[in-house]
Regions:
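A conserved regulatory-domain signal marking ACT and ACT-like small-molecule sensing domains
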Residues: 1, 7-14, 18, 24-29, ...
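Short beta-strand scaffold segments in enzyme catalytic cores
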Residues: 40-43
Length: 154
């Protein structure tokens, strides 16, 4: 919701979330015991009933880390504008993504590729120094090897 760590609205964040139509619930994880103490799993569902499960960790001091998307271990902080591409693990897909970014003068600060297994679903995480163009997700989605694109803008 874009709140800073010292934002006074944090104490009312649950009500604010409900007011803007964000449906949420808290379910304690009683199965996994070997996770960071400030871990949250977020199951997101869109209007088409597509699901994605994100695991994040609060590291303190307003810092957080995303460590899992679905069942794939990833690692990024969200300190930069971030592009998350869910794709097939095939030759040429990363080249396509970087060409789309280059064509729009996006400077890549960090880029990592994570995958379920060879030839299966992969996740490209691209962190940029600046804001990502509004239409970059639409451009990248044009590839038949890309199933979804998400953007975290700072």
């Amino acid at each position: 919701m874009g709140f800073g760590t010292d934002d006074m609205r944090i104490r009312d964040s649950f009500e604010i979330a409900k007011d803007i139509g964000l449906d949420f619930s808290f379910v304690p994880n009683e199965i996994e015991t070997d996770v960071h103490p400030n871990t949250v799993d977020i199951l997101m569902t869109n209007e088409n009933e597509d699901h994605i499960l994100i695991r994040g960790e609060s590291l303190g001091g307003g810092k957080a880390r995303i460590c899992r998307i679905n069942d794939v271990e990833v690692d990024f902080t969200g300190e930069y504008s971030t592009l998350i591409v869910i794709q097939k693990d095939k030759p040429g897909v990363v080249t396509y993504i970087t060409k789309c970014l280059s064509d729009q003068d996006v400077n890549i600060a960090f880029m990592r590729l994570f995958r379920e297994s060879k030839g299966n679903t992969a996740y490209s995480i691209v962190e940029s120094d600046g804001l990502l163009p509004e239409n970059i997700a639409e451009e990248i989605r044009k590839s038949p090897n890309v199933s979804d694109v998400m953007i975290i803008q700072l």
